[in-house]
């Protein structure tokens, strides 16, 4: 998530230009998350940057938060980011499922990221890193606290 105003359509007077706010400096946070499309159970952590060590930390925390169930496969749908493919990753009780190249839309969590950005970050600019973190935490907690809404966003309709 960044402090870049998300563009939307708006009406303006003919011949005038709409003002688009910007801060002039770059503030960024990375969210790594997992969602169960059926139950809406959602887990995420916020980082300043992502690499294989950070991703391993996230996997370790996810493994503690989502315990294994006998007879249940736990799939992690992943894009082809370099840190997803490091040979030394400990997957715990999860099974990685890599998407074909250039097809992130097949990942259910991508719909959640789009909704989160639309609902919480359209037309909003973070003034500080703390502002961004507060807004981001509020947005993530909303989806954690409303699993039925999260499931409806992320589930595949048949």
In which residue ranges do the predicted regions lie?
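RNase H-like two-metal-ion nuclease catalytic core shared by retroviral integrases
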Residues: 28, 78-80, 99-119, 130-132
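Short amphipathic alpha-helical segments
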Residues: 6-8, 88-91
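Acidic, metal-coordinating catalytic cores used for nucleic-acid/nucleotide bond scission
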Residues: 1, 50-51, 74-87, 101-106
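Short, basic/hydrophobic alpha-helical segments
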Residues: 54-73
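Extended, low-complexity cationic-aromatic segments
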Residues: 1-56, 60, 156-157
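C-terminal anion-handling pockets and recognition modules
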Residues: 110-158
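RNase H-like polynucleotidyl transferase catalytic core
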Residues: 16-24, 92-111, 124-125
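Short, conserved catalytic/metal-binding motifs centered on acidic residues
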Residues: 1, 33, 40, 59, ...
């Amino acid at each position: 998530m960044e402090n870049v105003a998300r563009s939307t359509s708006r009406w303006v007077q003919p011949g005038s230009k709409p003002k688009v706010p910007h801060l002039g400096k770059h503030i960024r946070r990375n969210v790594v998350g997992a969602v169960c499309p059926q139950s809406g159970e959602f887990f995420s952590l916020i980082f300043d940057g992502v690499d294989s060590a950070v991703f391993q930390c996230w996997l370790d925390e996810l493994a503690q938060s989502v315990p294994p169930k006998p007879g249940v496969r736990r799939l992690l749908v992943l894009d082809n980011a370099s840190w997803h493919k490091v040979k030394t990753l400990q997957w715990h009780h999860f099974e990685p499922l890599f998407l074909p190249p250039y097809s992130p839309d097949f990942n259910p969590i991508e719909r959640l990221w789009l909704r989160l950005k639309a609902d919480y970050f359209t037309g909003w600019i973070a003034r500080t890193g703390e502002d961004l973190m507060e807004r981001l935490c509020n947005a993530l907690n909303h989806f954690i606290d409303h699993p039925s809404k999260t499931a409806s966003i992320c589930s595949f309709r048949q």
